[in-house]
Amino acid sequence: MTRSLKKNPFVANHLLKKIDKLNTKAEKEIIVTWSRASTIIPTMIGHTIGIHNGKEHLPIYITDRMVGHKLGEFAPTLNFRGHAKSDNRSRR
């Protein structure tokens, strides 16, 4: 279910402050965050954000096509390695 249009998109306050501070300094550095639920807004374009996937922070470069999506969509938490292989040789 999508968020109501009369509400603003959710962005964590600490993340918004970090982005505004970097925009005023015009410097590029990785912003580390655990807020996967934050929505990508146009002021984030051009920044690299380290999004936590439960184990480590994955650096994601924000482009204009990502606006409106959540940060967590770009940092997968599960790593599917395939189904267990059947070992028929050990059964014989």
From Swiss-Prot:
SUPFAM superfamilies: Ribosomal protein S19 (SSF54570). GO terms for biological process: ribosomal small subunit assembly; translation. One of its GO terms (cellular component) is mitochondrial small ribosomal subunit. GO terms for molecular function: rRNA binding; structural constituent of ribosome. InterPro entries: Ribosomal_uS19, Ribosomal_uS19_bac-type, Ribosomal_uS19_CS, Ribosomal_uS19_SF. Gene3D superfamilies: 30s Ribosomal Protein S19, Chain A (3.30.860.10). It is found in: Plastid, Chloroplast. Keywords: Chloroplast, Plastid, Ribonucleoprotein, Ribosomal protein, RNA-binding, rRNA-binding. The keyword Plastid applies. Pfam families: Ribosomal_S19. Belongs to the universal ribosomal protein uS19 family. PANTHER family: RIBOSOMAL PROTEIN S19P FAMILY MEMBER (PTHR11880), SMALL RIBOSOMAL SUBUNIT PROTEIN US19M (PTHR11880:SF8). Protein S19 forms a complex with S13 that binds strongly to the 16S ribosomal RNA. This is Small ribosomal subunit protein uS19c. It comes from Coffea arabica. The gene is rps19.
